[in-house]
Every structure is written in structure tokens, then in C-alpha cells.
From Swiss-Prot:
Keywords: Disulfide bond, Glycoprotein, Glycosyltransferase, Golgi apparatus, Membrane, Signal-anchor, Transferase, Transmembrane, Transmembrane helix
Function: Transfers sialic acid from the donor of substrate CMP-sialic acid to galactose containing acceptor substrates.
Glycosylation site list: N167, N308, N338
Name under which the protein is recorded: Beta-galactoside alpha-2,6-sialyltransferase 2
Predominant location: Golgi
Organism placement in taxonomy: Eukaryota, Metazoa, Chordata, Craniata, Vertebrata
Species this chain originates from: Gallus gallus (Chicken)
Originating gene: ST6GAL2
Amino acid sequence: MKPNLKQWKQLMLFGIFAWGLLFLVIFIYFTDSNSAEPVPSSFSYIETKRLLPLQGKQRVIMGAIHDPSFSEAIDGNEVLLNEDLLDTFKSETGSIKKWTDLEDAFRSEDEFFPSQIGRKSKSAFYQVNDDYLFAAGQPMSHNSFQEIAKFISADEDNPKESILQNNWSRQRRMRRRSTKHRRSQMLDESDDWDGLYSTMSKSFLYKLWKGDVSSKMLNPRLQKAMKDYLSTNKHGVRFKGKRNSKLTGDQLFCELKERVDVKTIDGKEAPFSTLGWEKHVPQIPLGKLYTHGFGSCAVVMSAGAILNSSLGDEIDSHDAVLRFNSAPTRGYEKDVGNKTTMRIINSQILTNPNHHFVDSSLYKDVILVAWDPAPYSANLNWYKKPDYNLFTPYVQHRKKNPNQPFYILHPKFIWQLWDIIQENTKEKIQPNPPSSGFIGILIMMSMCNEVHVYEYIPSVRQTDLCHYHELYYDAACTLGAYHPLLYEKLLVQRMNKGLQDDLYRKGKVILPGFKSVKCPERNNFPPL
């Protein structure tokens, strides 16, 4: 019995070994065969983003949420409309009207795709497919552009129109089904992140060009940001005026001319008077620095959309050029030029060592105009508790550079602009100061005969890239979260005297200076 038992045990061990060997062979076979197949990236886009280097510089966005935990790299600028398509706009009679026929093809169920929530990839929502217009943040394929160009320029009775529209409708329905699932999935993943980012739809951009947008068309998170700022009311805004939007562009211009007073801290009001500030501030007010003013002026926004614009020579041809914050010219001359006459800087520039305010050439040999958010009451006790303490570096700079014109804007001027924006907007706007861009436009309108503003209202190169010199993507930089940017841009669009083609191609708005236009008597305006 014992030999048989021993043989039985040996047989069992041999069987177990054989099964193990067979399992190992099968496992190796399948793993080898899978490795021969194309394998998707071993990291999701979100996981890969965590491996990207973080942005080194602090972003100079007054009041913006600062969260450098994500970064995004996109090859080139995210262009919304191809030049071939734009050429068709220009050449065809009634082409703008035909563009409205395409709006539905560009529109998803929302005016704003929340496809950058948490600065996550657009490809998280939309598959990369050449047949999809601007899918996943990629440029449209050449064939797709040719089809659209043919569609726009075709005759009204061309049967290809209905075929193409039907094809787009079918693709759109398929995309919506997959998008809803992807969108809900991404929203679930990003519930713990409170950023406010979205990507502009093509129909929204077109409506912005026409001045026909509202906050209801924004991404839900941007809408939530606006509601949060309204409820927080950090600056104690108590608006007592009336809201309407009935003024024409010319009437709005005259309203601004009548009421805007570019006021700076002159050292004569308390507490500055008791601190001896009269000896620190320039003796000549900003408005009288150039007695005859300027002829033509350029206001150059720092928006990423100005990349690849080749506007540098045109910008430098102006008599004066205004730039903002830490926006450089070196290395970007082809797109932004190199002339700088004035630079508007917010208080973060003076206080954050990363901006090298003390020793950078950006802030030398130019007029400097600084500002800091103050209470709506414009109480100058704000000196004791500014958002960022710009006063100490200001005095230090004035002592070292007494001949350089350097001003601090009076809170009364800043909130005066806010009042005018709110009075001319039906909706309640964010109770926060206007953007540096809007402030700069109004300052130059008071000093120049004509003002050319570049990429304030975005061109066809519109992108979520905040600044042309920083790798940071945020749709709030274009439409506003903290600042009432959307409403500012609608006012500027209303006053635009430039060509529509310049707006589409260059992102250029032309505004008359206050001294160049004679306005009628104030009682001719409708009551505010």
C-alpha cells in the first residue's frame, strides 16, 4: 500500500506541475500577442498632465483663483476659423448672413462647452476626428475647410447644402450621445475642483462679434462664479443707479466722455496728505503729461490670440502704445511690436518678486500707471489695507526714479467706470473693479485722437491661452470670472468704428478719442 500511495502522490505533484506549466504558456502567449497590437497611451490625459512641469511664474490676473496644480500644452494656437474660410466671408456677398445658417452646425446643446473643467483636456469630451469641426481642440482638416468654404460660397439652390447639413446633423446627434456620457463622467471626476474654465463655442464667438451675448450663454461654472462674486460682494458695492442698455454706440461714447475723469492719487487727500505724499507723486498730472495728446494709439492686450497675428509693424506705427503688466516684447516683435509708451500694472506686479519690478527693463523708460482694488466707497483708508501693498514699492521707486512718470489710479476713477458698465447693462455684473484692459482703453481715449485696441474682443485666433507669454489656459481670461469682462467687451463692441473684417482677422476695434468728437448736449440722451 505504501508504494502505491507514494506513486499516487508523485502523480498528483506531476499533474499540478503540468497544469501550472500549461497556464504559464497560455499567459505568455496572450501577453505576447497583445503587445504586438497598437496600445493606447499608458497614461490618461489627466494623469499625464500631473507629470507636466508647473508654471513657474505667478499669473497676474487680479482676483483670479490661483491654482498651479495643472498645466496644459497645446501645439500652436487653438484657431477657431481658418483663413480660407475667412477669405470666403470677405469675398462673398451676404456671406455673414450665410454664416448664421451655419451656426446650428457649430452649436452643441450648450452655447458653451464645459470642456476644460479643471483645465482637463478637450479630448476628454470629444474624440479626435477630422470629420468633427474643431474636435478635441485640434484644427479642422484641410478637406473639412474646403467643404465648408464651398458650402458658404454655393448658390442658394445648391443641393449640396442640404446633403452637408444632413451629414452634420447626423454627426452632431452621434456626438451628443457620446458627449453627454463623457461630460457627466468628467464632472464626477472634477467635483472636488472649483476652477472656472470652459471653451468658447463658434456660435458664441460670432455672437460676441455682433454684441449679442449674455451671461446665460456661459458655462455653468462661469455662471456660478458670477453668482458667488455677487453674493460675496467683497468690495461693498452699493449700486443705486438704473440699469439699461438703450444707448447707441455714439450716445455711450458721449456718456463716457462726459463722466470719465482720469484721476490719480495726488497726495492732497488724507491719509496721503498727512504722510507727505505730495513730494512723491509726479507734479504733472497724467492727463496733462502730453499737452497736445497723441494722434493714433494702440492698446495691445496680452491675450494668447495675438500670437501668429503678424501685427507688430502695424502696432509700432502708432504714435503711442499701451501694454499691460509683465507682457514682454522681446521675442514677440513680429506679433506685438516693440514700442511701449505706457504700461498699466496691477499691484501684484509691484509686490511679487517674480516680476522683478525693481530691475526689469520692462518697467523702465515708460509711463507707469498702477492700480489696486479698493472699496466701492473709494475711501482712501484703503491705504492701510490694500489687496497688495503697492504703496511701499511705489515710494521706493519714486525716490530712485524721480523723473519717471509713475501714477497710482484713484479708486474713484475705477469705480466710476464700473458704474457706467452697470448702468448700460441689463444684468447685474460682478461687483468687482473693471479689468486693466478696460481701464487702459479709457485712459487712452482721454489722451489720443483715435485708439486701436488689439485682441480685446477676440479674433478668429481666439484661444483659451490667457497670455501670449505664459503657458496657462483659462477661458475666464477672455470672458471674466472676477472682472465683468463680458460686459466691458459688449460696451466696447457697441462703440466700435472699425471694420468687421478687422475685428474678425485682427481682433481690432477702433474707438475715437474724447477730444476728436463733439457730443450733443447731455439732455438729448435718454434718462439713465
